[in-house]
A protein has these predicted regions:
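GT-A fold catalytic core of metal-dependent nucleotide-sugar glycosyltransferases
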Residues: 1-43, 50-51
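Residues that flank catalytic or metal-binding motifs in active/ligand-binding sites
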Residues: 7, 43-47, 78, 122-123
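Short, surface-exposed, charged loop/turn segments at secondary-structure junctions
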Residues: 21-22, 40, 47-49, 65, ...
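Conserved nucleotide-sugar donor-binding
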Residues: 46-60
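Catalytic core and acceptor-binding pocket of nucleotide-sugar-dependent glycosyltransferases
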Residues: 57-173
Length: 173
């Protein structure tokens, strides 16, 4: 009962989630998809989302009623389905862009990625690792691509590994 906060597996929590839970009560909340935003299109990104099953039954009911048609309409994208259904029902709000950020676009942008290690903006609550580098690659440093090059990222080791181990105990990982 109450809101559900969902995460992809390729994210790291770096700040308090209280603001995400309090943002726009009664609305589905997602971050604006980076690629769709650049193209001027309205679509949420599914890496972090909040909804309430009791307040947003249409997310399940419409899909259950005609799954094939709904998947076709959303072009196979669960984030397009979720965000557009909520928009159609006037219960959608974007998460502020500085709360849920992209490692490659916001922490480690080209060409600065060659000059300094990735930075963690102070307002960031969640960092998403969509594409390369993957989280383990970013910790160690990544040399697989000109624009995705990353120096060793110590703050990621701290937030993703060390704090998780402290929370879950030495037997983790």
């Amino acid at each position: 009962q109450g809101p559900v906060l969902g995460f992809d597996l390729d994210v790291v929590i770096t700040g308090s989630l209280d603001d995400l839970l309090a943002l726009a009560p009664g609305h589905v909340v997602m971050r604006h998809d980076w690629n769709e935003a650049r193209k001027g299109r309205p679509t949420g990104h599914g890496s972090v989302f909040r909804y309430d099953p009791l307040e947003h039954p249409f997310l399940y009911e419409d899909l259950a009623a005609d799954a094939y048609a709904e998947v076709e309409r959303a072009r196979g994208s669960e984030q397009r389905y979720t965000s557009h259904k909520a928009m159609d029902n006037s219960v959608f709000t974007y998460i502020p862009g500085d709360w849920v950020i992209s490692f490659k676009y916001d922490c480690n942008p080209f060409p600065g990625n060659y000059l300094r290690p990735a930075t963690l903006p102070t307002a960031a609550k969640v960092v998403c690792f969509h594409g390369r580098p993957k989280m383990p690659e970013a910790i160690e440093g990544y040399r697989g691509s000109l624009i995705r090059y990353a120096k060793q990222t110590d703050w990621l080791q701290d937030h993703w590994v060390d704090r998780t181990r402290a929370d879950l105990g030495a037997q983790w990982g």
